[in-house]
């Protein structure tokens, strides 16, 4: 690594960059351990598609292109738009999910043991801790993504800073 003291830049030569292999949950579509965003207009079916993919992962089924899910596992959902009882669980069941492999973040426990509203902009380390202790977790589904963004949604730096932990 070369450090340019004048500009305080940390620069690395490409020859020193270690190549890492990408592992795929769904080949060429969903990389494991990476942020993937389903984008589209409101009401176009992003949540339904995400739940269909999650269902495939819980049972080791086939993805929309016919390829088999080789990395079946568990799903963690954080949703601020859809109710688990009347929307999420019924859709997961309709898609054939093994609902015993799906969990949803509903609250956080405070220091004094009381349940409080989960605030992803402050409580994301709790998700990280959960993920590190859940070796079979294959997908963290956040819906909508703006629910984890703090600051001004119109400022790229605020959005990027909020999404960095993901």
What do the PLM-derived regions correspond to, one by one?
Residues 49, 53:
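Hydrophobic positions on the alpha1 helix immediately C-terminal to the Walker A/P-loop
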Residues 35:
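Walker A (P-loop) ATP-phosphate-binding motif of ABC ATPase nucleotide-binding domains
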Residues 58:
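Gly/Ala-rich phosphate-binding loop of Rossmann-like dinucleotide-binding domains
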Residues 6, 21, 25-26, 42, ...:
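Conserved inter-motif catalytic segment of the P-loop NTP-binding fold
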Residues 45:
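Conserved glycine(s) of the Walker
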Residues 31:
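Residues immediately N-terminal to the Walker A/P-loop in ABC ATPase nucleotide-binding domains
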Residues 1-9:
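Charged, amphipathic alpha-helical linker segments immediately N-terminal to NTP-binding catalytic cores
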Residues 38:
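Hydrophobic anchor at the beta1->P-loop junction of P-loop NTPases
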């Amino acid at each position: 690594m070369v450090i340019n003291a004048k500009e305080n830049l940390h620069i690395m030569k490409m020859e020193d960059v270690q190549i890492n292999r990408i592992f795929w949950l769904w080949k060429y579509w969903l990389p494991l351990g990476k942020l993937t965003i389903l984008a589209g207009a409101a009401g176009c079916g992003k949540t339904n598609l995400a739940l269909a993919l999650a269902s495939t992962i819980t049972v080791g089924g086939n993805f929309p292109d016919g390829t088999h899910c080789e990395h079946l596992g568990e799903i963690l959902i954080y949703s601020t738009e859809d109710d688990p009882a009347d929307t999420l669980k019924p859709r997961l069941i309709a898609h054939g999910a093994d609902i015993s492999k799906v969990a949803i973040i509903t609250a956080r426990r405070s220091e004094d043991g009381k349940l409080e509203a989960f605030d992803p902009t402050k409580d994301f380390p709790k998700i990280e801790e959960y993920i590190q202790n859940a070796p079979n977790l294959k997908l963290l589904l956040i819906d909508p993504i703006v629910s984890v963004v703090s600051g001004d949604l119109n400022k790229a730096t605020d959005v990027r800073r909020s999404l960095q932990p993901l």
